Amino acid sequence: MNTLIEKYKKNSNFRLAVQLLFILVLSRVVMLIMVPVYNGIMGTNRSFSFLMNEWDAKRYQFMVDNGYTFPLDTDPQANWAFFPMYVIVCQFVKLLTFWKADTYWVGMFVSNVCIYIAAYFGIKWLRDRYEINNGTQPDINNNYGILLGVLMFMAPYSFYCASVYTEAMFIMFIVLFFYFSQKKQWLIAGLMSAFASATRIVGCTLVFALIIELYLDYKNKNTVIDSKKAGIWQNVRDFVIHFIKMPKEILSVMLCPLGTFIYMTFLRFFCGDVWAFMHVQIAWREDSYFPVIGVMWKACTGQIEPRYTYMGWFCIAAFAVYAYMIYRKYYSMAFFGIIALLVPLTSHVMSTCRFIIGSFVIFIGAYDLMTAGGREYLELKNEKKIITIDSIVLIIFFALELFLLFLWYNSDCWLM
């Protein structure tokens, strides 16, 4: 015991792992406590695993146990829309139990492990970024960055990361992508993007984030002509010339969409349509709007259901956060967040709240607003005021998460 205490005091990585585990367990205990609260209010007697796994979770449960729907099956909502990475990992974990464990519990275990890993490396990314920008390490004894873990475990809509949904795994691969990109380990970053693209289609768009990271790295090494002395196009041209001479960087970029390409190849032989994951989407979304602009106009002006009006304005808020992140020089993250949101907005605003949370970068924007960026804007220097404001924001976030969790347990359509 004394050895562990000593290790906790001296080893910052071990201390971070323990702190995050405590926060994760605490957040999940709250979810457990909400089960009898929900059952008492609604007069039901449902289990935790039942309440935590709505809608798509049931499809993932079916896929883990039975695989993809065969082309001759009559289900109009064929599960080809769901990418395979999460299912494969859940199947492997269930195999370790000799197929005895309940699939929902297997999926929740995988999701919680993934979001825990994501939070750990997300904070490591923050601390490395601080050191790069300031030339000195942050005060880790003051738990620098731990707020990010609190947001990822307890912020509104974070319950998706505890259920049998792909959000936690997708976030993990995104975090690892940015973590290794910051360390200039481009091949590993490309591999993480490949895994992300095998988890959700928008994982492919990490290729743009990688190109931005490569460009910024090249520019920071002073190998690109100063943009004040030369136009932006000359800078880009010089970067492209450099890029095509670097096979390692080219391979890293080519790896990014590999997961999606492998899945498309599988679909070609399985059902004869490489775009089946896209074509089957019509079973969920019958409405037809002009991409992005038409979708947002219809939603934000209340021309469709009230829940979609809410989601439309939620998207507006997300775009505002991404714009702020560009101002704060989180370039690759901000552009990834924008592109990842534009993809679903080509058809509808349905589920965009989940997609925004599931792209991870919104957590970084919120974290920056609650720490350095927000303090700079509000010109806050009094530590007590800072702590008070952050505490109020966290309490509001936690209250919203409890409210949304109750709606989730109740299968409320506002979360679809």
What are the language-model segments listed below?
Residues 253-257, 373-415:
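Signature aromatic-anchored transmembrane alpha helix within multi-pass, membrane-resident enzymes
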Residues 135-142, 177-188, 218-221:
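Membrane-interface transmembrane helices that cradle and orient dolichyl/undecaprenyl
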Residues 1-42, 244-255, 385-394:
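Start-transfer (signal-anchor) and selected internal transmembrane alpha helices
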Residues 27-39, 43, 52, 195-196, ...:
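Membrane-lumen/periplasm interface segments of specific transmembrane helices
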